[in-house]
Amino acid sequence: MNQEDKEKPIEEASSSMEREHMFDKVVTPSDVGKLNRLVIPKQHAERYFPLDNSTTNDSNKGLLLNFEDRSGNSWRFRYSYWNSSQSYVMTKGWSRFVKDKKLDAGDIVSFQRDSCNKDKLYIDWRRRPKIPDHHHQQFAGAMFPRFYTFPHPQMPTNYETHNLYHRFHQRDLGIGYYVRSMERSHPTAVIESVPVMMQRRAQVASMASRGEKRLRLFGVDMECGGGGGSVNSTEEESSSSGGSIPRGRVSMVGAGSLLQLRLVSSDDESLVAMEAASLEDHHFFTKKGKPSLSFDLDR
């Protein structure tokens, strides 16, 4: 008895090794539904279960195929060709196999045959592979990544100035982002150690004291007045303020009047002031009655 028990597994193993795998079919919802039929792929049907012309033309006919499962139970299916759908199907007996094995959509049915006896067929099944739960989480994480709020770095408060322009410092956070420090409030520009705003206020005060009038024409401030010695007061005012004479000054001198164009450069705006004053003293002219043109450019 012991020797026979040892020989049985050997025979079963040898028989399983002699089986030839034909094809696998993943059952669809219609294969396990109310249609009571299993669709066989055309390439596999014509290769392993060929039908003659008479069987193909009559869908009611067909072949009766006998299969054996892993438990040794026999299963008989009617195999035929449907002209309406142009497909090869197993009909009769298939619904009973589905109920017995409790097949569901996605399960796999395997067809085999004996390598020596081609007419001896086997059928087997296995459940659909289970997808791990974390796979969906990883996929969802790849499609919809989480967004984290990164802390805002504290930028240094000291800024360097060069030629009245601020340098924008960049700081690499190590996460692919660059943060630039933007300073909205610019300090008052200083030209030759004298603030522009203070110089402008001094000019307005001097104009009021001399009784001059100010006119804005075509976006240019025109300063007109009849007081004498306006040039001297302007030069004295500039020298007393610590040499805050603008970098460029063009003076046009006439016989009875003086036209002075002053260009002031600052960080925020350009101030253009034109002063016109009548001169009673003609000691500024080398020749009386003749106009002269002078350019005074301070660099």
Swiss-Prot record:
Gene Ontology molecular function terms on file? DNA binding; DNA-binding transcription factor activity
Please give the PROSITE patterns that the UniProt record associates with this protein: B3
Q: Which residues bind DNA?
A: 23-129
Its annotated compartments are: Nucleus
Spans annotated as Disordered:
1-21, 226-249
* One Gene Ontology CC term in the entry: nucleus
Which keywords fit this entry according to its UniProt record?
A: DNA-binding, Nucleus, Transcription, Transcription regulation
Question: What's the protein here called?
Answer: B3 domain-containing transcription factor NGA2
Name its species.
Arabidopsis thaliana
Name of the coding gene: NGA2
